[in-house]
Structure formats: structure tokens, C-alpha cells
Amino acid sequence: MIQVISDVLTPDELKRFRELLGQAQWQDGRATAGHVAVRAKANEQLSHEDSLGQQLSEFLLERLGKISHFIAAALPLKVLPPRFNRYTGGGSYGDHIDNAIFSVPGAGVRIRGDLSATLFLSEPGDYDGGELIIQGEFARHQFKLPAGQMILYPASTFHQVTPVTRGARLAAFFWTQSLVREHSRRALLFELDNTIQALAQDNPEQPAVARLTGLYHNLLREWSET
């Protein structure tokens, strides 16, 4: 299940993010890649210890907790603090699958990466290339979203970022450990949740709303891990 989540940041917030990231001290992104992915990775990232990155990361974590689409689709248990990357001058990231387990810096906590997310911070017209290509079950999907939109997808899928041949592609990225590990079960719960919301909007008093809501919570109870 791939989801596009709109309006994560406002235009003013995006402008401020880009201004601050324009002053940041970027480092070679290969420092955080695994021994296989390092050969495919050519970008820049902010250090986990960068105070600016930590400030922006905390802001995004708080915002994510208020976005109902993200919560319904991801059913988050733990979220790795967002990180930031930049692609310029032909930078790219070849086909790879993300690591399964991540450590939260300074917290002594590990999370399982069930879902990957990329929040676009640069407008599509500000750079050439830089498409995020995700291998779906039956086809490859290509994304180059407007700034402020986020793509959420299973971390178990192959994906890549095509070379950026003009301008700079700024993005935030992070991983989520879901209450429901299995992607197909999470997708069923998301569809059921959407159905309940649609029925409740038309007629919240109809008995089917209560029955389906009960079914949703019983399935979540059966499938969730805390």
C-alpha cells in the first residue's frame, strides 16, 4: 500500500525549512548506508547530532502526530526521528531496500522499519531528475511530489532516487514501526477505517457504523503488537 499524504507543511513552513537547510552543514550520505547500499548511494545528509536537524526533526514529529491520514495508514507504534537529505550535481540512490532495524540516536531504543516515508521539501520545478521510483507488486511507480507532500510506502520494497541533474532536491525521510507488522493486514484496516468514516459522515446513527467500528477494533486487537 502506497499513500500520498498532502499538506504536511504549510507554504510558510516550507520556506523556513528551505532557508534553514540552505545554511546547514551537509555530510556525505554514504556514512549512514549499509555495506551493500553504500555502493548505490550518492547524496548528502545532515548528521544525527546536527542541532538544526534535531530542531526540524522535532517539529516534524509533532506535526505527524496530528495528521489523521498518516496515523490511519501507518498505525504508528514508534517513529524514527526524521532525517534530511540533499541531492545535487548528479546525486542519486540506486535500487535498494532499507535496513530492517534502526537505532534511535541517544535513546538506546531500536525500531523495526515497517514503513518508509519521504517528505518533499523542494518544488518539482526547482530540480531535474530526482524521481522516487518504488517497485510495486505489479509495476514500478514514479513520484516527484509538490513540496509539502509525503509518500508513505512499505520499507520492504525496492526503490531508488534518479540522478538530479539540475538544482537541488531537499527532503525529509524517516521510518515507522507499525502496530500491525503485516502490510496486507494494515491495508485492510485502512480500507475498513475509510469505509467507517464515509458511512458515519452520511448517517452516523446507522447500526452498521457501530458494528464495523467494533470489527475494526477487534481486528486491531487481534493483529497489533505493542
Swiss-Prot record:
Gene Ontology BP terms: DNA damage response; intracellular iron ion homeostasis
Ranges for domain Fe2OG dioxygenase: 78-178
UniProt-listed Enzyme Commission number(s): 1.14.11.-
Record's keyword annotation contains Cell membrane: no
InterPro entries reported in the protein's UniProt record: Oxoglu/Fe-dep_dioxygenase_dom, PKHD_C, PKHD_hydroxylase, Pro_4_hyd_alph, Pro_4_hyd_alph_FE2OG_OXY
Binding residues for 2-oxoglutarate: 169
UniProt keyword Metal-binding, yes or no: yes
Pfam families on file: 2OG-FeII_Oxy_3, PKHD_C
Highest taxon above the source species: Bacteria
Binding site for Fe cation: 96, 98, 159
Protein keywords: Dioxygenase, Iron, Metal-binding, Oxidoreductase, Vitamin C
One MF annotation (Gene Ontology) recorded for this entry: iron ion binding
HAMAP family, per the entry: Hydroxyl_YbiX
NCBIfam families: PRK05467.1-3, PRK05467.1-4
Name of protein: PKHD-type hydroxylase Nwi_0701
